[in-house]
C-alpha cells in the first residue's frame, strides 16, 4: 500500500547499485537471466544477492586460512562465516556501495551489524525514508542472550567452548 514503511536490516531495493548494474549487463544482457528483469534490484532480489555475496565471501575467507582453491569443509566455511570482515572498501569493490553497512562477524557475534534503515513504498517503488539507525546493543545483547539461553536450555544444547572459535 502506498505510504507503507518497513525497517530494513542492511539492504533494501537498490536498482542503481553497481552489483545490480553488473547483473543486468552480464547476466540479463546476454539473455541468461531466469527471472523477471524488472525484479532485479528489488527488495527480495537484493535479499538473495546479499545472502549469496556473504556465502561467497565466507568461502573466500575460509580459503585464505585453509588453502586457496581447495574445496572447503562445512567446518571451514563456518569459520569463514564467523570471521567475515567486509569493510567499506571491500563492499565498494564488490559493487555493494550504498547497499549495506560494513559487516564484521565472530564466533560470539554472528549478527555482525546492528544497523537498519526505513524505506517507504510510494505506489511504484521503494524509497529510503531514513538514514541508517544503529540498535542500542546495551539493550539488544541481553535480550538476545536471554532468548539464546532459554532456547539452549529448552533444547538441551551445549554451547560451543571459546577455544572452538579458532579465530
Where are these regions (language model features)?
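Sequence contexts marking disulfide-bonded cysteines in secreted/extracellular proteins
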Residues: 106-108, 162-167
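Extracellular/periplasmic periplasmic-binding protein-like sensory domains
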Residues: 1-50, 132-133, 147
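Short, cationic low-complexity segments
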Residues: 133-161
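Segments of small-molecule ligand-sensing domains
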Residues: 33-45, 52, 56-130
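Short, flexible coil/linker elements and helix-boundary hinge sites characteristic
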Residues: 28-29, 67-68, 85, 95, ...
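Short, charged N-terminal helix-start/capping segments
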Residues: 86-90, 160, 167
Amino acid at each position: 500500500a502506498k505510504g507503507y514503511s518497513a525497517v530494513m536490516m542492511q539492504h533494501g531495493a537498490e536498482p542503481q547499485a553497481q552489483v545490480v548494474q553488473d547483473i543486468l549487463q552480464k547476466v540479463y544482457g546476454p539473455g541468461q537471466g531466469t527471472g523477471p528483469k524488472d525484479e532485479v534490484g528489488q527488495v527480495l532480489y537484493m535479499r538473495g544477492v546479499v545472502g549469496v555475496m556473504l556465502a561467497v565471501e565466507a568461502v573466500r575467507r575460509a580459503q585464505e586460512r585453509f588453502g586457496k582453491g581447495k574445496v572447503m569443509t562445512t567446518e571451514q566455511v563456518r569459520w569463514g562465516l564467523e570471521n567475515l570482515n567486509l569493510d567499506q572498501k571491500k563492499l565498494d569493490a564488490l559493487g555493494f556501495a550504498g547497499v549495506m553497512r560494513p559487516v564484521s562477524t565472530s564466533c560470539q557475534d554472528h549478527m555482525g551489524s546492528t544497523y537498519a534503515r526505513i524505506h517507504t513504498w510510494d505506489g511504484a517503488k521503494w524509497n529510503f525514508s531514513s538514514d541508517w539507525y544503529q540498535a542500542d546493543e546495551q539493550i539488544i545483547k541481553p535480550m538476545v542472550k536471554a532468548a539464546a539461553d532459554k532456547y539452549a536450555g529448552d533444547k538441551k544444547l551445549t554451547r560451543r567452548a571459546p577455544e572452538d572459535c579458532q579465530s
